[in-house]
Amino acid sequence: MKMIVGLGNIGKEYDKTRHNTGFMVVDELAKKHDINNFKVQSDALIADFRVNGEKVLLVKPTTYMNDSGRAVRPLMDYYDVDLNDMIVAYDDMDMPVGKIRLRQKGSAGGHNGIKSIIAHVGTQSFNRVRVGIDHPTKESVVDYVLGKFRKEQITDFEIGVQNAVAALEDWTTIENFSQLMNKYN
């Protein structure tokens, strides 16, 4: 089984905000595969589907961003998901809007959702797909990540989400993560 985790904050007030990029990636993947049967389990909304016979679990933690690991670890244990079979989609302020980058491991880079997952799984060695949201120029980081994309950013962001979805679909069938990184980075 593969597990795709999208990071975000629950609540209507966070819909379409930059920090909900991971949720938007998972939602777009679900939409593409006609998945609308999310249910609540272990502080998360989950749904599953199959790709080439492989079961894939979509996960959207219902904890706030900073406590995402509390939802992820129990699901990994319950479904017996190996770290190599999990990937996390999330926003990255250090990349231009819509740019994606895949990584196999690394620090949290200041992202509190990733920091929480690292703390709960006990390692930095897990797959990630980051989608660029750019860095604030005038506003505070908190106001920026909890804000919505500017009109001129929307097209680039939507392209980034589509590229992240394509990378996640490929990830479900490609065993060599380095090949995937070469294709998308």
From Swiss-Prot:
It is an enzyme of class 3 (hydrolase). Keywords: Cytoplasm, Hydrolase, RNA-binding, tRNA-binding. GO terms for biological process: protein quality control for misfolded or incompletely synthesized proteins; rescue of stalled ribosome. TRNA binds at Y14, Y64, N66, N112. Gene3D superfamilies: Peptidyl-tRNA hydrolase (3.40.50.1470). Its EC number is 3.1.1.29. Pfam families: Pept_tRNA_hydro. It catalyses: an N-acyl-L-alpha-aminoacyl-tRNA + H2O = an N-acyl-L-amino acid + a tRNA + H(+). This is Peptidyl-tRNA hydrolase. The gene is pth.
